[in-house]
């Protein structure tokens, strides 16, 4: 009986930890993460204070913080090839990182670190040098900066059969040296690395290549992490938010369901299907059942996105900044529909898969510059600074915890819906105008369309809609309009 009680206690404790790892630890009603891909720590600190906090963003996903290999031309993916766990990269050093985390936390912006637990750097001829000056010999699996040696890795093999679980979780992903997470020593080094980041005040982690690690090994690592640092405003006994990269298109040998009990999972099907819909390959009317009705994970388990730093570079259905009208429509739907833990992308311009972030002649990452409209210049795209996107972050905050209601569609690619009595969204992806009297569910009054303009000193710089006593308003979105979206909410009442 005592053994049973102990087993039950341990089981409940484990379940409690796993549930806690689904909590992003947001402030107030904020509920959108932005991925500031390849930004420098000092620039992120300023962005938290000057832009993200005033506009209601909840958190920032940052690029990997650990020392990485220096690759010719400095492609973005060198950040995903660790040399050591020293916190020195082209984004800055440990002091700059710690300063950024503190400053962002002080204004209610949480920091989530992209972490590499699966592997170290891939093959390199001779001695490789990292961004902190540490030497390593990847071909010999020698990483003195940790230190790791050959005994800490799985035997070398290629993934040639993606239906073979052993290969997927033990062989080398694109030649990257595959760590043995079942080893007590490797586990201890990974926990030490993550705990150091927790001590510095981060709120959680995006776990790269999670499907290439056994879920039971990850569970051990997560369960043995420290609680979040209360000196950064986290409650006592709060756990790190975990979201895991698991690419699962369905019928995979390693499935997302093996990981969703440990934390959230990146819902790649969301990205693919929303791209198909707004590219015109699936009628928007079908989005009424969006979410689990499409075979997606439960809402609180799904990290959702239109595109990410990987798939935005691939050919296919996924939308990116190069299709701005469709991208903004898809993002508006993403942030308005009550499904998932939302993340928006902030990119730099790229011409090919390997394009590095904007850099100077000495290969130092350069800071973004801003135009008069607040948008980014000098090679940075900064989708999060597009009015149509940051306005929808405000919309999502305004309608938090409300239900979707009053769905309307024209049987094709014009849709509209309410979020309780706090928000209304309409989208026109047809080649003809949307002109319709629709129920906005809002209290009577005049509302600023936050897509076409902003509410400044009580006046709307874009379109506005007058809502009558029954909650109805005349909605017009021309086929040739710049954005194809109209959004109203209670915090944008004129």
Curated annotation (Swiss-Prot):
Chain sites annotated for binding chloride: 206, 308, 343
InterPro entries registered for this protein in UniProt: A-amylase/branching_C, A-amylase_C, Alpha_amylase, Glyco_hydro_13_cat_dom, Glyco_hydro_b, Glycoside_hydrolase_SF
Keyword terms: Calcium, Carbohydrate metabolism, Chloride, Disulfide bond, Glycosidase, Hydrolase, Metal-binding, Pyrrolidone carboxylic acid, Secreted, Signal
UniProt cross-references to Gene3D superfamilies, sorted A to Z: Glycosidases, Golgi alpha-mannosidase II
Active site residues per record: 208 (nucleophile), 245 (proton donor)
Gene Ontology MF terms: alpha-amylase activity; metal ion binding
Disulfide bonds: 48-104, 157-171, 376-382, 418-441, 448-460
Cofactor: Ca(2+); chloride
Any one Gene Ontology cellular component term annotated for this protein: extracellular region
Subcellular location: Secreted
EC number(s) stated in the UniProt entry for this protein: 3.2.1.1
ATP-binding as UniProt keyword: no
Signal sequence range: 1-20
Catalytic activity reported: Endohydrolysis of (1->4)-alpha-D-glucosidic linkages in polysaccharides containing three or more (1->4)-alpha-linked D-glucose units
A biological process from GO: carbohydrate metabolic process
Residue list for modification Pyrrolidone carboxylic acid: 21
Key word Acetylation present: no
Binding site for Ca(2+): 118, 169, 178, 212
EC class name: hydrolase
Subunit structure: Monomer.
Descriptive protein name: Alpha-amylase-related protein
Organism: Drosophila auraria
